[in-house]
C-alpha cells in the first residue's frame, strides 16, 4: 500500500514539475491573434447579454409590474413585433402597450417578481418568469360584455424570448399556458 502511494506521489510530482516551464523562454507567447479576437468577441457578447438581461429584469419587475408604460421604449423598439401565447402577433410599441394594459383591467395586481432562469446567445435572450395576480375586476370580452371576477389568484410560469438590436428588443415571443391560466382564474374546469 505504501509503495502504491509512493508511486502515485511521484507521478503527481512529475506531472506538476512537467507543467511548470523550466525557464521564462519556455512560457507560451500568448494566444494567436485569431484566438485573441475570438476571446474579445465572446467577452463583448457576454457583456451585451448581461446588459440586455438586466434591462429585461427592469422591464418585468418594474416597468410591467408597475404599469410604467412610458418607459417601455427602454426595452422595446418603436416597431417591435410581439408574438403572443394565443398565436396572434402585434406590430409596434403602441399596440403592445395597449395589449399589456388590457391584462391589468381584470387583474390590476398582475406582477412578475422573479426570473429564476435567464440566459442569452448572440442577439437573443430568454427568461423564465412567474406571473401572479388576482382576477378581481370585470374582464371585457367585447361588444360591451364582461365576465365577472371570480376573485381567484393565478400563478403561472411564463417565458419570454427576445431578439435585441441596438439595446432594445425588436422582436419578442411570449409563452405561457393559457388553459392553465384560465383554470386558475376559474374560467375553465
Language-model-detected regions and their locations in the chain:
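Bacterial N-terminal signal peptides that target proteins for export
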Residues: 1-9
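Serine/proline-rich low-complexity intrinsically disordered segments, especially terminal tails, linkers
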Residues: 8-11, 20
Amino acid at each position: 500500500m505504501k509503495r502504491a502511494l509512493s508511486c502515485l506521489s511521484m507521478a503527481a510530482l512529475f506531472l506538476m514539475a512537467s507543467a511548470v516551464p523550466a525557464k521564462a523562454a519556455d512560457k507560451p507567447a500568448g494566444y494567436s491573434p485569431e484566438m485573441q479576437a475570438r476571446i474579445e468577441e465572446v467577452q463583448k457578447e457576454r457583456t451585451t447579454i448581461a446588459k440586455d438581461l438586466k434591462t429585461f429584469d427592469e422591464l418585468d419587475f418594474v416597468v410591467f409590474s408597475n404599469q410604467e408604460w412610458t418607459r417601455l421604449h427602454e426595452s422595446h423598439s418603436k416597431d417591435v413585433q410581439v408574438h403572443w401565447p394565443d398565436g396572434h402577433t402585434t406590430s409596434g410599441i403602441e399596440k403592445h402597450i395597449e395589449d399589456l394594459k388590457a391584462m391589468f383591467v381584470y387583474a390590476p395586481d398582475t406582477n412578475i417578481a422573479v426570473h429564476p432562469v435567464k440566459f442569452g446567445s448572440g442577439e437573443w435572450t430568454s427568461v423564465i418568469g412567474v406571473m401572479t395576480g388576482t382576477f378581481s375586476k370585470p374582464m371585457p370580452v367585447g361588444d360591451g360584455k364582461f365576465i365577472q371576477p371570480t376573485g381567484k389568484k393565478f400563478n403561472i410560469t411564463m417565458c419570454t424570448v427576445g431578439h435585441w438590436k441596438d439595446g432594445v428588443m425588436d422582436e419578442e415571443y411570449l409563452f405561457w399556458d393559457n388553459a392553465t391560466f384560465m383554470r386558475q382564474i376559474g374560467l375553465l374546469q
